[in-house]
Amino acid sequence: LAVISTAAARDRLTLSYMASSGVHMAMALLAKDKAESNFDSLAEDWAVPEKIEELLQEIPFDAGKLSVAITDELSKIQVNALVKFPDSRQFNESQVMLWDRFLRFIRNEEELEDENNPVAIVNSVKDWLDSGDDEATTGLSGAESSYYEDLDPPYASRNGPIQDLDELLLIKGITPQIYYDNPDAPGLASFMTVHGMAAGAGTSFNWPGRININTADGPVIAALLGLEDQDLAQAIVEFRQEALEDKDNHDFSNPRWYKEIPGFGDVVINPSLVSVGSDVFRIQSDASIDTTKASIIAVVQRVQDPESRKWTCKVLSWKTE
């Protein structure tokens, strides 16, 4: 029994080292990419599984398997961009429209009634984020601390930036059915992020809320389009995928590349909502030895040293499973 226990402990230690090595390999790849490219697309090495597998082959391990996946965190809707920080008292109107279109795309009208309708949800999220407003409720459907303190168990509104995406489940109107994916429809959790904060003047901060159109999934692209154009989202995704196979003839550094699609001449995406680059990425590193497994999920941000001008990755979050 002691021998088995020792072997299991050794495997867990090895797996932890393997998974950590995968994250650091991904960070090095992202830093290299930033030094070589001024935009980010699914054609780049960090997004191509075969390229990542080649790099993993260079990490020597006596046993076990290691896999790494990198995704663009700013391909998602930035929840904290819904209001204008640092005072957080005013809506970002373009983000309000983004939320409304997204909710109406992922859920049917029957699921978006009463407290679950887009206006009610957006108002409640704003009240969760805002501060210094003397508990003023947004519209007829928002919710401040007094609402949450009457629940069982009671809790207070954050009145500040959301720090963990699961906080959305605490907000009036956001049910598990809306938050999580289900067999019939995607949920908020797959397409939103708390990351994306940018420095403002002095010590202030804000969330620009720009979404990388080169990496965004279909439901997010649908939210970028007007309600009358949402059925075109799949055409954008398919064109982008086909363009990846002929990337030398397509310019992903131009956020209006979607205009190249036949029939898209009159389609307009709000330029304040899109970008073609990102510096925030999610890395998932999975290691296994026989039936024993370990995973690390890290969110990192690319930063440049002001003196050396060298790019590195700063860890924003690190979760071990």
Language-model-derived ranges and their functions:
Residues 1-321:
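Compositionally biased linear targeting/interaction segments
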